[in-house]
């Protein structure tokens, strides 16, 4: 028996050593097709988010491959369904790294799932870019974790400013998901910002994900007579909340974040959603030629479906990754990590993307009004303040970027040989155009899904 334990111990030690060797070997670029793992919810409660992520990343990868790939190498996306569950997200990311041998990861949308999966990427030194997880904790997990979206402190501040300055609200109620890192984070930052602007929180009510009866919480909120109601949840509950609020005679506008942005929201909430507001990453109505080309191409590829913000962010995440691989000269772990971290002034469809020292994107937000099954542009809020306009300012066409190659819809110089002896430089040659500008002096604390 003792010998068996010794033998078992030796086997475990050898396997551990072999695992470390394999992980170390994996840091070297294996050449050939570049495998990228994409994970998201394709069959669970937030499957709309996962499908948009899959569509956006695949569209970007197809465009890259059609132009000859990255330095002559094709890109292969391997999609995994995490069913919207944190534990499953961690499992599929481990599978993508250890079995599929992916060189980088894109995902997730929900912050709780990214927080669960990111430690596996960090430990393996596989760079991970989340398109749309806005909770501040995500990128704090380690230096291989990045995002191309703004973060929750900024998003909460955006709607507090809109409520106080544009809607002239003095009294706000909050209805949040007590099981969601995203919802709890937005609640905190909206509350802090609204109070700092002179507002009062008159009621704060909680619900649990998958709840379908919100009448008790809404009755409490109605009795507090708020001017606005902040509901920082996901679309599958928000649509039901909006309908029940109208049934109870509540006329105060509801406000939320990017978690509302899904086609299914309208099926759940219908006309009860009219006159409510959300913060989001871009507007599909922006007249920028680059954005309108993206929208038209997406509709052509996906049977007339318009790209929501999740799809646009996923597209940008893949394009940022492609550009970073080009500048890194390949997919060696540390070189690719450094190239992503050096991303600067990348002109994506959701705005100009520059990553700060915390690996968060510094960029503005837009406020959209819900009306007749559409998200209508209201105003842009910069990190430094509000920049209202009747409609989004048209961005320069891609050809106006004098630093870019003739085809500015691709990551810069995809087919050119990279200087592998140089530290990756910040990118200024990326696709698209700035949808609403940015403040390069924005504090990293004013930014979070």
Give residue spans per PLM region.
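Hydrophobic alpha-helical segments within soluble ligand-binding/sensing domains
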Residues: 89, 148-171, 184-186, 213-215, ...
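Short, low-complexity disordered leader/linker segments with a strong preference
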Residues: 1-35, 385-449
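An alpha-beta-alpha
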Residues: 145-206, 228, 321
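Beta-alpha junction/loop-to-helix N-cap segments that form part of ligand/metal-binding clefts
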Residues: 21-29, 48-53, 63, 67-139, ...
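Extracytoplasmic "Venus flytrap"
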Residues: 27-56, 80-87, 109-112, 175-184, ...
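Extracellular/periplasmic bilobed ligand-binding domains
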Residues: 121, 187-279, 389, 393
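Extracellular/periplasmic periplasmic-binding protein-like sensory domains
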Residues: 242-315, 369-389, 393, 399, ...
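Segments of small-molecule ligand-sensing domains
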Residues: 301-312, 322-377
């Amino acid at each position: 028996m003792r010998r068996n334990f010794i033998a078992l111990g030796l086997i475990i030690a050898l396997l551990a050593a072999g695992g470390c060797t394999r992980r170390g070997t994996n840091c070297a670029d294996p050449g050939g097709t570049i495998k990228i793992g994409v994970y998201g919810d394709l069959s669970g409660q937030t499957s709309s988010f996962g499908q948009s992520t899959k569509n956006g990343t695949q569209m970007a990868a197809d465009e890259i491959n059609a132009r000859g790939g990255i330095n002559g190498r094709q890109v292969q996306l391997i999609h995994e369904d995490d069913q919207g569950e944190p534990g499953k997200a961690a499992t599929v990311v481990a599978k993508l790294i250890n079995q599929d041998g992916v060189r980088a990861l894109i995902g997730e949308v929900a912050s709780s799932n990214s927080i669960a999966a990111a430690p596996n990427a960090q430990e393996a030194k596989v760079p991970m870019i989340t398109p749309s997880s806005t909770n501040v904790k995500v990128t704090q997990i380690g230096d291989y974790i990045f995002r191309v979206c703004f973060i929750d402190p900024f998003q909460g501040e955006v709607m507090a400013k809109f409520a106080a300055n544009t809607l002239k609200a003095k009294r706000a109620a909050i209805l949040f998901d007590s099981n969601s890192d995203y919802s709890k984070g937005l609640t905190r930052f909206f509350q802090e910002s609204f109070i700092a602007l002179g507002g009062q929180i008159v009621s704060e009510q909680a619900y649990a994900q998958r709840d379908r009866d919100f009448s008790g919480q809404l009755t409490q909120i109605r009795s507090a007579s708020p001017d606005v109601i902040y509901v920082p949840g996901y679309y599958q509950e928000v649509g039901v909340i909006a309908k029940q609020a109208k049934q109870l005679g509540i006329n105060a506008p509801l406000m939320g974040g990017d978690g509302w942005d899904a086609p299914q929201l309208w099926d759940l909430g219908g006309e009860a959603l009219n006159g409510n507001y959300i913060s989001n990453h871009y507007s599909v109505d922006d007249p920028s030629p680059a954005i309108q080309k993206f929208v038209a191409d997406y509709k052509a590829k996906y049977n007339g479906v318009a790209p929501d913000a999740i799809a646009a962010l996923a597209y940008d995440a893949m394009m940022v990754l492609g550009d970073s691989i080009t500048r890194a000269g390949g997919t060696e772990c540390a070189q690719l990590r450094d190239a992503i971290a050096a991303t600067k002034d990348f002109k994506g469809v959701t705005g100009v993307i520059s990553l700060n020292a915390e690996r968060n994107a510094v960029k503005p937000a837009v406020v959209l009004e819900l009306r007749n099954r559409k998200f209508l542009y209201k105003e842009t809020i910069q990190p430094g303040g509000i920049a209202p306009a009747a409609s989004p300012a048209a961005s320069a066409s891609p050809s106006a970027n004098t630093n870019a190659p003739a085809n500015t819809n691709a990551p810069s110089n995809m087919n050119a040989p990279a200087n592998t002896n140089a530290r990756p430089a910040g990118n200024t040659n990326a696709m698209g155009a700035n949808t609403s500008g940015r403040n390069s002096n924005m504090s990293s604390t004013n930014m979070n899904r």
